[in-house]
Regions:
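Non-catalytic, polymerase-adjacent accessory regions of viral genome-replication enzymes
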Residues: 1-151
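Ordered hydrophobic segments in well-structured contexts
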Residues: 3, 20-22, 30, 39, ...
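Reverse-transcriptase-like RNA-dependent polymerase core
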Residues: 88-139, 193-207, 258-286, 301-311
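Helix-boundary capping/turn motifs
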Residues: 137-138, 166, 320
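Catalytic-core region of right-hand nucleic acid polymerases
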Residues: 146, 154, 158, 163, ...
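Active-site palm subdomain of RNA-directed nucleic acid polymerases
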Residues: 299-340
Length: 340
C-alpha cells in the first residue's frame, strides 16, 4: 500500500487537471526545502519547549486571571480545556493579528447572526435569514409544539433507548451543558444520538447531534460566502513537491478532540441553545454552554480556529478542514497534538 501511494504521488495525474498550488503553499514548500534540517528541528524544539513551559504555568495558576478579567465565569469554565492565554501569546509571537480564535475562548462565539467574510471561499447571495426577534418572540409557542410532537411520536429518531439516553444525560453533567433543568426561556432544538462504532474498551461510541435547523436557529445565521477547503489534490501536489526535492515525508491526520464542545457560546446567545429529547415516556431538557454539533455557525468558528492553528504551524503543510488537519511533513516534525 505504501509503495502504491508513493508511486501515485510521483507519477499519477491529479484528480483536477486544472489544479495549481496557491502561492502561499508554493512559497512554504520552497522555504521548507531550503531550510537545513538541523536548524528547522532546533527552532521547532525551542518553540515546543516554550509552549510546554507556558501551558504548565497557566495550569498551575488556573489560567491567567488578568486574561479572563470581566469574562463570563461559564465561558471561562468551558474554556479550561484550551489554554487561551498561551494561544494569544503565540499569535503575538508570530504576528498573527486576527484575534478571532483567542477571543472565542475568552468571550464565546456567536450562535446566530451574520457570519464574517473569511476570504476562504467565494462570495454568494443566500436566502434572507430569519429575523432573530421573530425567533425570540415565537419560542414559547414553538417549544410547546416540539414538546407535544416528542410526546406523540413513538418512532422518532429523537426517542432514545437506554444506552443513548444515558450518554445524553451523562453529557448534561459536563461543563458544556447545563444540568437537566427548565429551559422554557430558551429556544429548544431536538437532540438525538448516532452510533460511531466502538471505543477502545468495547463500549458503544455515540455522537450527540442537535437539529438546530428544525428549531429554526440555523435559519438566523446569514452566510456571505461559500467556504472552500483544500482538496486531496493540494495534499498530493505538496507531497509531490517534497518528493521531487528528495525530502522524506510522513502523513498525519490530527483530529481536534471534541472540537465543538471546546468553543463556548456567547452568553447573549444562550437563549437559542436549548435542547430536548425523549426517554422512557418523558422529555429531558438542557441548555448548551458550548457549541452543539449541528450549529451552522460552527463551520465559521472552526475555520477561524484552524486558520489560527495553521499559522502557528506555518512551516508544516496543512489542508484546511473544520475540525481536522491533514499534514504532510518531514518525519522529525512534532505532532499537532502538542499544541495547547
Amino acid at each position: 500500500m505504501i509503495s502504491f501511494i508513493t508511486s501515485a504521488m510521483q507519477e499519477s495525474p491529479l484528480f483536477d487537471k486544472s489544479y495549481s498550488m496557491d502561492a502561499d503553499l508554493s512559497n512554504a514548500v520552497a522555504w521548507n526545502v531550503a531550510r537545513p534540517d538541523e536548524k528547522l528541528k532546533a527552532e521547532q524544539e525551542h518553540i515546543m519547549h516554550w509552549i510546554e513551559e507556558r501551558v504548565a504555568a497557566c495550569k498551575l495558576q488556573r489560567h491567567d486571571v488578568e486574561w479572563f478579567r470581566n469574562c463570563c465565569p461559564i465561558v471561562q469554565k468551558v474554556s479550561e480545556g484550551v489554554c487561551g492565554p498561551v494561544l494569544q501569546e503565540l499569535c503575538d509571537m508570530i504576528g498573527h493579528n486576527d484575534r478571532a480564535a483567542p477571543d472565542l475562548f475568552r468571550y464565546g462565539g456567536p450562535l446566530i447572526g451574520k457570519l464574517p467574510c473569511t476570504g476562504n471561499g467565494k462570495e454568494h447571495i443566500f436566502p434572507a435569514p430569519t429575523d432573530v426577534c421573530d425567533m425570540w418572540n415565537s419560542r414559547a409557542t414553538d417549544n410547546a409544539a416540539l414538546h407535544n410532537k416528542l410526546k406523540e411520536d413513538k418512532h422518532s429518531k429523537f426517542l432514545m433507548d437506554q444506552c443513548k439516553a444515558d450518554a445524553m444525560l451523562c453529557r448534561m453533567s459536563e461543563p458544556h451543558l447545563l444540568e437537566p433543568d427548565d429551559v422554557s426561556g430558551t429556544r429548544i432544538s431536538p437532540g438525538f444520538c448516532v452510533e460511531q462504532g466502538l471505543k477502545e474498551d468495547g463500549s458503544l461510541k455515540l455522537r450527540a447531534i442537535y437539529d438546530l435547523s428544525r428549531s429554526g436557529v440555523n435559519a438566523c445565521t446569514e452566510a456571505v460566502e461559500k467556504l472552500s477547503y483544500d482538496s486531496i489534490d493540494a495534499l498530493f501536489a505538496v507531497s509531490r513537491s517534497f518528493m521531487q526535492q528528495g525530502r522524506p515525508i510522513a502523513f498525519l491526520k490530527a483530529d481536534i478532540d471534541a472540537a465543538y464542545r471546546r468553543v463556548p457560546i456567547d452568553p447573549r446567545h444562550r437563549w437559542a441553545a436549548g435542547v430536548m429529547f425523549k426517554y422512557n415516556g418523558a422529555t429531558q431538557s438542557s441548555c448548551h454552554y458550548s457549541f452543539p454539533f449541528g450549529a451552522k455557525q460552527l463551520s465559521m468558528r472552526g475555520t477561524e480556529l484552524v486558520h489560527c492553528l495553521q499559522t502557528l504551524r506555518a512551516k508544516s503543510f496543512t489542508c484546511r478542514c473544520c475540525a481536522s488537519w491533514m499534514i504532510s511533513s518531514r518525519r522529525h516534525q512534532r505532532n499537532a497534538q502538542s499544541m495547547p
